């Protein structure tokens, strides 16, 4: 059997709580209940009402009906004791719920025959918790003796004064002295209560410790097999990227960071002359956008400054490019037109943004509506012509050929 050296996980603690195995500092709960009762007793328990009832019966001199007499005493008892009992019950229930983290132990209500097992009973009898309870009992005996000694030194005059007290004040004095004795005992027992709670917490976690195999098995049950989880993640990302793929294919170009940010830009002056952010992805999705754009022939421009600026100034997808970034976007569009003209071997186009209505303006790049078409490169394209992917808007290469690959464009 493997040695249990690992701390219990959160799931292990939750499952144990459902079975009733929670950290319980019962003595602290008892301390709260006793302190609440001692402080509330003088205000809630009115013994003068009992004395007044005796006086009323004696003054009438009549023989009361036994049934009515018992019913009257029962009502009087409930009126006096009910508020006190309810307050003490609430004072005991609230700390218990806090210790169990408001978890109801449903499984602990079931009848369990294993609790009658004599072998387990002997193990509990000679367990660390039993030894702790025995030491705690001895400490409480010492605390009680200390409490009596301190109480006698402090209030012996009041105790002996009870013999000379008036009957009307006798009940009140007894209540006051009893409350003082109880509070003094709780104060002296406080160190023992704290020590008991610390030891109980240690034993609770010691009983729920796990071995390494249990931790791995629980991780597999809660998180699933690593290979299956990775496959699910890939499928999920693939399903989510269908819309993004369509937006990439319809973009005029992709500006990259080069690996952490990918921004798709779409321009159609016939509709609105302002560039439009069609794709806005980061990290792994940005790399996927770049790969898909290169596969479909959509230009990819690696410009760190422009990509970061658009990402910062255009916080949402399907929003217009910020006024501060329009100049940089238009420069890229003009450069793309020059690259296409150089690939065709013709004169450079006019210095304006290409539109989706003019697909013939860019050889090697499919129009926004058909970016992945098979005729992305026309038959009359010069040998060696290439789509303007991962290029740089530095202008066409000499002699009207394809532009030289100058690497990333970092503004």
UniProtKB/Swiss-Prot annotation:
Q: Does the keyword Zinc apply?
A: no
Q: Which GO terms describe its biological process?
A: protein secretion
Q: How does it sit in the membrane?
A: Multi-pass membrane protein
Keyword entries, A-Z: Cell membrane, Membrane, Transmembrane, Transmembrane helix, Virulence
The cellular component terms of Gene Ontology attached to this UniProt record, alphabetical and capped at eight, are: plasma membrane
Looking at the UniProt entry, the stretches that span the membrane are 28-48, 80-100, 137-157, 175-195
Q: Pfam families recorded for this chain?
A: Bac_export_2
What job does the chain carry out? Answer: Part of the bsa type III secretion system, is involved in the intracellular replication of invading bacteria inside the host cell. Probably necessary for the lysis of the vacuole membrane and escape into the host cell cytoplasm.
Q: What is this protein called?
A: Secretion apparatus protein BsaZ
Source species, please? Answer: Burkholderia pseudomallei (strain K96243)
């Amino acid at each position: 059997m493997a040695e249990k050296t690992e701390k219990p996980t959160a799931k292990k603690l939750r499952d144990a709580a459902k079975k009733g195995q929670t950290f319980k500092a019962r003595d602290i709960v008892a301390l709260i209940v006793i302190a609440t009762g001692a402080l509330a007793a003088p205000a809630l328990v009115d013994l003068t009402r009992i004395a007044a009832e005796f006086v009323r019966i004696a003054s009438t001199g009549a023989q009361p009906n036994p049934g009515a007499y018992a019913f009257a005493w029962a009502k009087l008892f409930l009126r006096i004791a009910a508020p006190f009992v309810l307050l003490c019950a609430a004072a005991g229930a609230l700390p218990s719920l806090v210790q169990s983290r408001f978890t109801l132990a449903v499984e602990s209500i079931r009848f369990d025959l294993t609790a009658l097992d004599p072998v387990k009973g002997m193990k509990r009898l000679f367990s660390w918790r039993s030894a702790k309870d025995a030491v705690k009992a001895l400490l409480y005996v010492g605390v009680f003796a200390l409490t009596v000694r301190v109480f006698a030194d402090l209030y012996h005059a009041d105790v002996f004064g009870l013999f000379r007290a008036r009957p009307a004040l006798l009940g009140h004095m007894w209540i006051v002295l009893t409350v003082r004795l109880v509070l003094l005992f709780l104060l002296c027992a406080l160190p023992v209560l704290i020590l008991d709670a610390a030891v109980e917490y240690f034993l609770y976690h010691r009983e729920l410790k796990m071995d390494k195999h249990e931790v791995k098995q629980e991780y597999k049950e809660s998180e699933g097999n690593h290979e299956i989880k990775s496959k699910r993640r890939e499928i999920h990302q693939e399903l989510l990227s269908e819309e993004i793929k369509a937006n990439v294919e319809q973009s005029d170009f992709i500006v990259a960071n080069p690996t952490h940010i990918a921004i798709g830009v779409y321009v159609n002056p016939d509709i609105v002359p302002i560039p439009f952010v069609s794709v806005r992805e980061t990290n792994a999705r940005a790399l996927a956008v770049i790969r898909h754009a290169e596969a479909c022939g959509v230009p990819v421009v690696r410009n760190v400054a422009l990509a970061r600026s658009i990402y910062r100034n255009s916080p949402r997808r399907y929003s217009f490019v910020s006024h501060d970034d329009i100049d940089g976007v238009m420069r890229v569009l003009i450069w793309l037109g020059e690259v296409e003209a150089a690939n065709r071997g013709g004169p450079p186009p006019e210095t304006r943004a290409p539109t989706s209505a003019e697909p013939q303006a860019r050889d090697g790049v499919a129009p926004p509506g058909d970016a992945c078409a098979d005729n992305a490169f026309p038959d009359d394209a010069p040998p060696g012509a290439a789509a303007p992917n991962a290029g740089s808007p530095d202008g066409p290469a000499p002699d009207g050929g394809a532009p030289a690959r100058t690497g990333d464009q970092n503004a």
